[in-house]
Amino acid sequence: MTESVDKLAEEFLHIASHLRLAILLDLHKTKTNLSTLSKKLDTTSSEIHRNLTRLTDANLIQRDSTGNYSLTTYGNMVCANIQSWEFFLLNSKYFSKHTFGNLENNFIQSIGSLHDSKHVQGFINTQDIWKKIYKNSKQYIYNILFEVSYDSETIEIIKSQIKKGIIINSVFSKKAIISEKRKTAVDDLDIKTAIKNQQLSRKISDDVQVLVVLNENEGCVMFPKSDGDVDVSEAFYGTTKSFHDWCLAYFQSCWTKSGSFYEEKMKK
């Protein structure tokens, strides 16, 4: 145990330098050579060379025959974890009042996928993001929801997308907060037809804590408060592939585990 801890501490020393960390993160974007790194990081070539040598000796980076440096498999793994730390540190104030809820370990371990995102604050602003995602959809809309809005603008967007053939899949919490306008919405002919044709599909989950709304290119995710309450007043919105892939994988996992939808389960 002591030996492994000592080895781990030694590995952390390799990235405990601002310059070495900057080199790693730059190489995580693209391979490059010594002179380019020197210009980018505004550091002498000799200092860059010294740190490149240390990172190479630590098996974090490698040099090819053309003189370009790139990350090793180990280096890529380290950078992936650095992104997780970065996401958490940049949003430390948010996470002082929020948790990861019931996220499985694989989603927590890949939380760095969300690092390139925008922190949206305010209930109205998060609702605007949802509507934006709905409007921008060209293929599908996927939701994991606790509070379900049936305001006229949202319903019109949904109906418009249904007419375009957009697939809509939603996981609702068994304890979902439902608007009194729900009955009118589900009785709408376009929506009833979409449900019948399975263009609009729904499932029920006993334990919804982390929420997502996404289309094929963008998404947003909302984490619960420290007391366990779902919070839709703040969200993280992103358009990168890594952000979207994380949201999609999480939705698919929840969709697979959720049960069949029955209208009588949805109480006002």
Report each predicted region and the residues it spans:
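Residue at a beta-strand N-cap/secondary-structure junction
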Residues: 30-31, 68
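Alpha-helical "hinge/linker" immediately C-terminal to small N-terminal DNA-binding modules
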Residues: 77-91
